[in-house]
Structure formats: structure tokens, C-alpha cells
Regions:
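Conserved pre-catalytic core of RNA-dependent polymerases
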Residues: 1-31, 70, 231
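Short, conserved catalytic/metal-binding micro-motifs enriched in Asp/Glu and His
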Residues: 3, 33, 62-64, 92, ...
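Short, conserved micro-motifs composed of acidic
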Residues: 19, 83, 98-131
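Active-site palm subdomain of RNA-directed nucleic acid polymerases
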Residues: 20, 38-69
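Catalytic palm subdomain of template-directed nucleic-acid polymerases
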Residues: 36, 66-90, 195
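Short, charged alpha-helical motifs in flexible N/C-terminal segments and linkers
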Residues: 89-107, 200-268
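Basic, alpha-helical interaction scaffolds
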Residues: 123-191
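Low-complexity, glycine/alanine/valine/leucine- and proline-rich hydrophobic stretches
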Residues: 265-300
Length: 329
């Protein structure tokens, strides 16, 4: 009864200055900012996700952003995906929602991926080479270069704006602005797209290198000297630490992810190193070897005994004392 009263009989007005518009009835939606709103939306959308999962496809959703994907081996797999899309359209029609074909897309992943044609309400869904998924550019080849070029461009623009806007010559203040407004751009979700190619690694590092070189009094220092003077790590080192933090969270159950999906524990009896070593899978594909679950294993297994695994804060603190020899910066 309470939910029914919450959803029905609602009205709103618009106020401009001291004037109020006529009262209008709200026929759909809920109050923005309400505590129960997100919970009600999950109840609303979960019905669709349960129905789509019956077609033996993988479904993921974040708010109203729904993704469906399946391995295409023959025409039957394409038909199965199309049936799931038809169910989505029928559900939207039932709930009086409109789906725009132009806001949907098909991404064929892999070198040997066949062209798949999917339609929504008699309109063909466009096939794209890349799509932005929760802020990360995912390409057909799964290469991070497109995303890296995008974030580097935005980060350089933000860094230049900071140097133009701040008249202060306080190095610490300028560096604090960089850490607050620029560094998050090139580090958001880095465990998803962390690069392996030298060109991409240097492209990202160049953002911090250029900014620190333009700080007052630091122009004639080398990049390593500037990092030591400012007491900051390289961006490459920060990405490696972020990988290890995520690895710790997954292994010790601090996130809602099953660890055996990503990692296989190594039950070897070797006394060298720590006791939480992982099994390293052999892979010949360059793209796969750079996935988070593959690239982090060697660094994780090579952590010294001095690292404290008892809690995440202690793990982070002791990780900062570890020297990694395979970094460029």
C-alpha cells in the first residue's frame, strides 16, 4: 500500500522567481534523489534481465544500460541473440518505453568475428568499430589505444587549463590541482585498459612529465628527479599498484566477484615468497596476455615476504615499499 501511494497521485510545479506554474500530474517516474528510488528501479529492470537470461546469452546491466553478448559460431547463435532483442522490444512496448535504434549498436569482437545484423522494431542496429562502456572505449580488436588517445587528449587539455588559470607559483598547490583534476582522467578504470605497448605507456606518462616540467623551478630537472622532489610515483607505477590492489580485493573476497573466475590458486610447496601465489596460465594470444587476470599474476607472485597480507590498508602500505624492476618509469 505504501509503495502504491508513493507512485500514484503525485503532482509537481515549476517555480521561476516568485511565480509558480499550474499544478501538473505526474503519470510516471519517481522523485529524484529519493532513497528508495534506485531500489525500485532495480526491481523494475530485473524482470527483463531474468527473462533475457532464458535465451542462453550473457546479459549485463548498469541502470538502464543493457548489454547482451554471445559467442557466434553459426546462424543459430545469431537467431538466439535476435530473439533476445525481440523480447527486450516487447518488454519496452508493454511498459510504454521507446527504444531508439540510433542509441543501440552492435560490436563484433575479434579478428575472425563474422558480421552480425540485428534489428530493432524493423530498424537495423548500426555496427560500430568502438563503443563507450561506462566511460571506457571498447574496440573491435580490444586494443586500449583508442581509449588511451582519448583520455590523454582530455588530460592534456585539463592540465593546460590549470597552468593558465593558476597565477600562483606554489609548486605544491599546482601539483595538488593536477592530482585532483588531471590524474583521475588517465587512471579511471585503468585495470580494464592498462596498456602493454611502449607507445601507449609513454603517451600516458607524458601527461605528468610535461606538467611537472612546466612547474616553477623544476624545468632543468630530469623526470626522475622531479618525481623524487614532488614525492609522487610515476603513472605506470600507480597502475601496477592499482592492479595489485584489485587482485587483493578479489582473492580475499572484498568485492562481489568470485575469485575462481579470475584466478587459480597455486598450491605449490615452495617456501620462496608469500603463500598466496596464483597459477599462471599459458596463453599465446597477445591481447589475452594483457588482460588483468593474466598480466597481474607474475607481479603478484613475485611480491616479497615483507608484504603484509593481513588487511588491505597494511597491504597498500607495504606495497609502496616494494621496488618493481620491470617498469619503464
Amino acid at each position: 500500500m505504501w509503495l502504491q501511494n508513493f507512485l500514484t497521485g503525485r503532482t509537481h510545479q515549476t517555480k521561476v522567481g516568485c511565480d509558480l506554474s499550474d499544478v501538473a500530474e505526474l503519470l510516471s517516474g519517481i522523485v529524484q534523489g529519493s532513497g528508495i528510488g534506485p531500489c525500485m528501479f532495480l526491481i523494475y529492470i530485473n524482470e527483463l534481465l531474468i527473462e533475457l537470461s532464458k535465451y542462453n546469452i550473457t546479459v549485463r546491466a548498469f541502470a538502464d544500460d543493457v548489454k547482451m553478448y554471445v559467442q557466434i559460431l553459426d546462424d543459430l547463435d545469431v537467431q538466439r541473440l535476435q530473439l533476445a532483442v525481440d523480447v527486450l522490444c516487447q518488454w519496452a512496448t508493454t511498459w510504454q518505453l521507446s527504444i531508439s535504434v540510433n542509441k543501440c549498436c552492435v560490436l563484433n569482437v575479434g579478428k575472425s568475428a563474422c558480421d552480425v545484423s540485428i534489428s530493432i522494431n524493423n530498424g537495423v542496429v548500426p555496427v560500430v568499430e568502438a563503443v563507450r562502456d561506462l566511460g571506457v572505449q571498447i574496440t573491435k580488436s580490444l586494443s586500449p589505444s583508442v581509449h588511451i588517445n582519448d583520455v590523454v587528449s582530455r588530460a592534456n587539455q585539463r592540465a593546460a587549463a590549470i597552468l593558465r588559470a593558476f597565477v600562483s607559483r606554489d609548486v605544491r598547490l599546482l601539483m595538488r590541482a593536477f592530482i585532483t583534476y588531471v590524474r583521475p582522467i588517465v587512471e579511471y578504470n585503468s585495470s580494464i585498459w592498462s596498456p602493454s605497448s611502449v607507445g601507449d605507456i609513454e603517451s600516458i606518462e607524458r601527461v605528468q612529465r610535461r606538467f611537472t616540467k612546466r612547474l616553477p623551478g623544476l624545468k632543468n630537472m630530469s623526470y626522475d628527479q622531479r618525481l623524487k622532489f614532488l614525492d609522487i610515483p610515476s603513472l605506470e607505477l600507480r597502475r601496477l599498484r592499482a592492479d595489485l590492489y584489485w587482485c587483493y580485493k578479489i582473492i580475499f573476497g572484498l568485492v562481489a566477484v568470485q575469485s575462481d573466475v579470475f584466478f587459480t590458486k597455486n598450491f605449490c610447496t615452495s617456501t620462496r615468497g608469500h603463500q598466496y601465489k596464483l597459477y599462471k596460465h599459458q596463453t599465446s594470444a597477445c591481447v589475452r596476455s594483457n588482460f588483468f587476470a593474466e598480466r597481474v599474476v607474475n607481479e603478484w607472485n613475485n611480491l616479497p615476504k615483507s608484504v603484509d597480507f593481513s588487511t588491505l590498508p597494511r597491504f597498500k602500505r607495504t606495497i609502496k615499499q616494494v621496488r618493481f624492476s620491470n617498469l619503464r618509469f
